[in-house]
Every structure is written in structure tokens, then in C-alpha cells.
């Protein structure tokens, strides 16, 4: 007979290892390429020493002259706060009792919940990789009334998400958290539940965030690929090596454009690109370019079951969350997802995973991970934007 105790045991012993492996390697092709480590985590912070420049103690001299003066490496310390990543499943008491005498039915129930958790995680963690940590899903493009909101883009939305409307500075407008009930991808609009918005409630320029995520998401590519401001506690104005290579208004994507960026990184930063990610429209434009010149399109198989185009042995992967008209050329060896620990179930003082929701006949279990993404060498990465899509 299935009991709460046996359900807890199943989540701990049978599901945790499998779901952790899938979350780490099958959520996103870029995430699968990034190493994960518990090193450099101190309390609630990541403190990592970053080396830049070269050692100064080298030189040539005469047979009897002075040896080169010793000059060590240059170091700075990156500091950032661990982000709190959660994934929650919910099972009703009725469903638990209905499957109490049928182990197979209960396994199917848990499998279905886990599958839903994986799909939601793949969507949200994949989205965060390209964000700037602010949690902004989209900006409101026009004043909106009723329950439909016009956005500048809806690629970060999915039916079922719980979102809120904020000012451009991240201040909650007090309109409550709303569940997305429809996503109009043709017209860049979303529909949410709850009370209809009135005039002046939602104005152009407002931002839409995931519940609880304002300035709480990981430091994604959107934060790394900037030329001003601070990152990891250091100023880009002072430390130019924190600024990646960024070329705008590219237009048509060609092998020459890609190679120029790769050569620049190699010559100026000693960085070797090993992973290229772009939007689907950019990938199609590159495929069209290859077809125009009768070039063969080579396909590579990546870890996690992903397939990619090949450019001189470098995988080119399209990602739904990559900004339109954009291609990133990365050395993933410079990236690390620093974490306090791998995915774990949130346990109560009694060691139980499944907990009853107060006042409701439902039980929840929550996966947690405390981590953030650090790029040790931002100047060794490149971004091409303004690419004409197909």
C-alpha cells in the first residue's frame, strides 16, 4: 500500500538522482556544456579569484646581464550572491488516496508530476541563461486594459506561468500575481486571469516579471554582454577585460563575419570559441547562406541528445530564448555554474519532503538549488547582433 512515507522515500531514492541528471544535462544545450562546481562558494556568496593579463616576469637579455624583473599575475576577486532556484510539484490528497492500493497508478502519478516539473524547468532555466538577472520577461509595448497585455516579445511566456506587472525600475504596481491563460505569438500579446486592468493600470514601458524573480535570477548572458556598469562587483569602466566583443548591425550572416569574431577573440584574448548559439532565424539565415554557395551542412551530435550544425568543428545550436537576430560565440571553458550543492529536496525538520499546504487538501514537494553563473573571462566571448533573419 502506498503511504506518505513510501512516497517520500520514492522521491528521495528513486527520483532525485534521475531528475538531477536531466536538469543538469537535458534542460538546455548551453547549460549541458557548462561545468558545475561547489568550489569558491563561501556562505551565501561566490568569491572567485580571476586572473587577467599576463605574467610580467619574462624577457630576453644578454649573456651576463640582469635577469627579468619578477612581476606576478594580475588578480581581481569576483563576488556575487548565490541565487535561489526552485521547482515545486503538487499532488492532491484525493489523487494520493485514489492510488493508495495501486502502486502502478501512484508511479504514473509521480512520473506525470516529474515530467511537468522537467518541462517547466527546461523552459525557465533555459530562459534565465539569456537573461540579465533582473527577471524581466518582457516590456509592455502599449497601454493595456482588460486582461490582455501587449508586449515587445512573448518568447519568454508560456501558458500557466504566474507573472506580475512592475514599473521599469522593478517596483510592484500592486496588481497582484496573475496566471498566464493565453499567449498570442502572432501579435505579441498575453492574456492573464484575475480582475480586468483599468485605464492607466498598465502603461507602455512597464515590465512583466515571473513571480518572486525580480533581481533574483542567475547572471545570464544578458548581464555578461554589456559595455557599461558593474558585473561581479567590478566596474567595466576600470576593467576593460570585463567587456566582451560585441558587433551590432551585422546584416547578412556569413562565414567571414563569424570567422572575424573568432579570430579577434583568439588574437586579443587567447580565447578559443567552442560553442556557438543563435536564434532560430539566424540559424536558418546561415543555412541559406551555405546553400547559396553549395556548401555541405555538417551535423554534430552533442551531449544530452542535442544536434547542431558544424562550423569548422564548432557546434552551432539554435535556442528559442536567444534574442532575435543574435549569435553568441562562446568559450564554455570560461563558464562555471557555482553551486552550494546540487539539486536537493527541501526537507522539513522531520525529514519529510511532501508537506501539506495549509488549509488545503494538497501536498507539495520542492527541489532547490543555490547557484549562480560566472564567466571568468568576459573578454573571451563575442556577440553578433542585428543579423538579418530568415
Predicted regions: what is each one?
Residues 65-68:
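Helix-start/capping segments and mature chain N-termini
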Residues 1-57, 71-390:
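Core alpha/beta structural scaffold of self-assembling particle/tube/pore-forming proteins
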Amino acid at each position: 500500500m502506498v503511504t506518505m512515507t513510501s512516497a517520500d522515500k520514492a522521491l528521495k531514492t528513486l527520483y532525485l538522482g534521475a531528475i538531477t541528471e536531466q536538469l543538469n544535462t537535458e534542460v538546455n544545450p548551453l547549460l549541458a556544456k557548462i561545468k558545475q562546481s561547489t568550489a569558491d562558494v563561501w556562505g551565501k556568496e561566490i568569491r572567485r579569484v580571476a586572473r587577467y593579463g599576463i605574467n610580467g616576469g619574462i624577457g630576453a637579455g644578454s649573456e651576463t646581464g640582469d635577469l627579468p624583473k619578477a612581476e606576478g599575475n594580475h588578480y581581481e576577486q569576483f563576488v556575487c550572491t548565490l541565487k535561489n532556484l526552485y521547482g515545486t510539484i503538487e499532488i492532491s490528497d484525493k489523487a494520493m488516496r485514489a492510488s493508495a492500493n495501486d502502486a502502478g497508478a501512484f508511479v504514473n502519478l509521480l512520473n506525470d508530476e516529474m515530467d511537468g516539473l522537467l518541462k517547466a524547468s527546461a523552459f525557465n532555466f533555459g530562459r534565465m541563461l539569456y537573461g540579465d538577472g533582473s527577471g524581466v520577461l518582457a516590456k509592455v509595448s502599449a497601454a493595456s486594459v482588460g486582461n490582455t497585455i501587449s508586449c515587445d516579445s512573448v518568447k519568454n511566456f508560456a501558458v500557466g506561468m504566474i507573472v506580475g506587472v512592475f514599473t521599469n525600475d522593478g517596483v510592484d504596481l500592486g496588481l497582484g500575481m496573475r496566471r498566464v491563460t493565453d499567449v498570442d505569438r502572432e501579435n505579441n500579446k498575453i492574456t492573464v486571469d484575475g480582475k480586468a486592468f483599468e485605464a492607466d493600470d498598465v502603461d507602455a514601458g512597464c515590465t512583466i516579471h515571473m513571480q518572486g524573480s525580480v533581481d533574483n535570477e542567475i547572471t545570464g548572458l544578458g548581464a555578461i554582454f554589456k559595455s557599461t556598469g558593474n558585473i561581479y562587483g567590478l566596474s567595466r569602466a576600470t576593467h576593460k577585460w570585463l567587456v566582451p566583443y560585441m558587433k551590432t548591425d551585422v546584416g547578412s550572416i556569413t562565414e567571414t563575419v563569424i570567422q572575424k569574431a573568432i579570430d579577434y577573440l583568439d588574437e586579443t584574448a587567447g580565447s578559443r570559441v567552442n560553442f556557438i548559439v543563435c536564434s532560430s532565424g539566424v540559424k536558418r539565415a546561415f543555412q541559406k547562406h551555405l546553400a547559396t554557395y553549395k556548401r555541405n551542412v555538417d551535423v554534430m551530435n552533442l551531449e544530452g541528445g542535442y544536434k547542431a550544425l558544424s562550423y569548422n568543428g564548432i557546434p552551432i545550436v539554435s535556442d528559442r530564448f536567444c534574442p532575435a537576430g543574435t549569435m553568441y560565440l562562446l568559450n564554455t571553458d570560461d563558464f562555471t555554474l557555482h553551486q552550494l550543492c546540487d539539486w536537493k529536496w527541501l526537507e522539513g525538520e522531520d525529514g519529510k519532503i511532501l508537506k501539506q499546504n495549509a488549509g488545503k487538501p494538497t501536498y507539495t514537494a520542492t527541489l532547490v538549488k543555490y547557484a549562480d553563473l560566472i564567466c571568468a573571462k568576459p573578454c573571451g566571448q563575442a556577440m553578433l547582433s542585428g543579423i538579418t533573419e530568415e
